Amino acid sequence: MEALIPVINKLQDVFNTVGADIIQLPQIVVVGTQSSGKSSVLESLVGRDLLPRGTGVVTRRPLILQLVHVSPEDKRKTTGEENDPATWKNSRHLSKGVEAEEWGKFLHTKNKLYTDFDEIRQEIENETERISGNNKGVSPEPIHLKVFSPNVVNLTLVDLPGMTKVPVGDQPKDIELQIRELILRFISNPNSIILAVTAANTDMATSEALKISREVDPDGRRTLAVITKLDLMDAGTDAMDVLMGRVIPVKLGIIGVVNRSQLDINNKKSVTDSIRDEYAFLQKKYPSLANRNGTKYLARTLNRLLMHHIRDCLPELKTRINVLAAQYQSLLNSYGEPVDDKSATLLQLITKFATEYCNTIEGTAKYIETSELCGGARICYIFHETFGRTLESVDPLGGLNTIDILTAIRNATGPRPALFVPEVSFELLVKRQIKRLEEPSLRCVELVHEEMQRIIQHCSNYSTQELLRFPKLHDAIVEVVTCLLRKRLPVTNEMVHNLVAIELAYINTKHPDFADACGLMNNNIEEQRRNRLARELPSAVSRDKSSKVPSALAPASQEPSPAASAEADGKLIQDNRRETKNVASAGGGIGDGGRIGDGGQEPTTGNWRGMLKTSKAEELLAEEKSKPIPIMPASPQKGHAVNLLDVPVPVARKLSAREQRDCEVIERLIKSYFLIVRKNIQDSVPKAVMHFLVNHVKDTLQSELVGQLYKSSLLDDLLTESEDMAQRRKEAADMLKALQGASQIIAEIRETHLW
């Protein structure tokens, strides 16, 4: 085992550097029948006489032997308080006051130390008899023993009671089954190597050790066969076929050893002398196999198996070291080198921050957020999604009802009854609706301002980690950018307010889109009027026989012919146009845009005035369709005295045809013009925000930072590192160096040959 000691020591340094758990080497579990030489094999591997020996049943309790490597300078370094079995199993605490090079300690004796291995052997016998009795009884309760030595590796060996068939002494009748279950409990651990011990003077085909090993390890990946007592075979026979695997092949190999006899033990023959005599015996009896058998070769084979296990763990350890090295290298880079030229460093950091801030807005930053929108992408989302959807959700006629429209029309006419809808009422109502676009526009400015504030934090956290070295510089940069954004906010709000005020200042009824909408609306209303007259005029005329109907409208039958309806429509329209022309020439109507010229041409804009004049027949039809709504009474009710100081009480009455049509016209005009203004606002507000806020900050950010921070009087204060920065830089450099050394150690272990 000595060959593994330097490897394990190197790995220990690696684990201490990386902070990983120590590789747990496999347990070596020895199984076999009674008196097959199991304990002798373990003693030869450890190199110490510490196990009870004798004839018959000697090992009657499992012995878990933990070998703990200690360097000579670590002896008597600490004191361990290890009373809990779980804690004791994983503990590597030493004890002070030990003068010997090697010592042992039992779990059941707590902190008592044993420097004489004869005392250890005697304590094992005493503890066995205390639990199992002194008459061949067997107990599954293990004995825990730790041996501390500079000549061992951190390894666990398990010595189990030998398999038996017939109970003796105090053994129960099912002793065979109990021992079998005990053995299976230990060898079922996948992280164990099974030493299947078989005596050479028995037939290997009847080996109970190999049989039970194959139950848990059918592929033979962790089973090593050991043939003991080669010197006790019958005269004229040898174990050549068995050792060469011709009888029963074993994947990991079959190794023969020669144990000390009871006479040798009684004569105090040392393990070293026994190994020397064993080598001489093998050279004499098995010269061709001498170099592949014996206790030394068994130890080398176990070393090889343990090294394979270690190497299987190295790739994961190597990956962890590489990841940590990359992290510490990045951390060291973020700490930067000590500042020599403060002026150049300050200018470099300011320039880098300004560049990263602008790049984040443009979408070309080095560190791009993947979990959410940020920077310019979020500003775009605010413009075209948040702001756009908010404007589209504003109802053009929201907050308006028929009473509001009629009241506005009446208030605009003053004391005189109006022949046409005054343009003042349209402007009053449409301005009221346009004013509702100002609040979402200002909210758009606020959202963009908040996002530009968030970009500051984004650049500080991801893009310019060097600023973390200088907390005062970081705070100063944040303050300058925040002040710049704060100064631009009222300017941008004022511009957005002006955009809405511009729309309110002049209602352009000659806007091309508005003129097209009015023309299309006139055609639709005119067509609806003709269709309604042609469909319902005959029934209306028959119910009013006392009134005088123009001869052109008198029906020839209950359902007039299409020609008669068309003729009646034509005359009504001509009458309306004549009346409209006469009134227009007298100066009535809404503005100059609706005036018909001397040549009798139709107006291009404001043509909707003509539809406000209706014929008597159409009023007769419309009165039947109008619905009652609460409206201020024009005259007092009969039977009630009138007091002009009383508040008028709304009563329900039907809208006249003209009132109904006036409301419909105003609503359509408001909606048409509101959509035009909303389109303008939706286009102009983002442009104003970009010009007065976003682009202005981008263009002036670096000059603002340089002007306020790049001053000789501020250099020392701004570039003062945090108190622990130098210490953290040193720790990161030391850790990086240690990780590089650990990586080199792993490379050396991969190239280590133990045989």
From Swiss-Prot:
Q: Does the keyword Cell division apply?
A: no
Question: Any one cellular component term from GO for this entry?
Answer: secretory vesicle
Q: What is the lineage of its organism?
A: Eukaryota, Metazoa, Chordata, Craniata, Vertebrata
Where is the segment annotated G2 motif? Answer: 58-60
Q: What is this protein called?
A: Dynamin-1-like protein
Output one GO BP term.
mitochondrial fission
**Assigned protein family:** Belongs to the TRAFAC class dynamin-like GTPase superfamily. Dynamin/Fzo/YdjA family.
List the InterPro entries hit by this protein, alphabetically. Dynamin (IPR022812), Dynamin_GTPase (IPR001401), Dynamin_GTPase_CS (IPR019762), Dynamin_N (IPR045063), Dynamin_stalk (IPR000375), G_DYNAMIN_dom (IPR030381), GED (IPR003130), GED_dom (IPR020850)
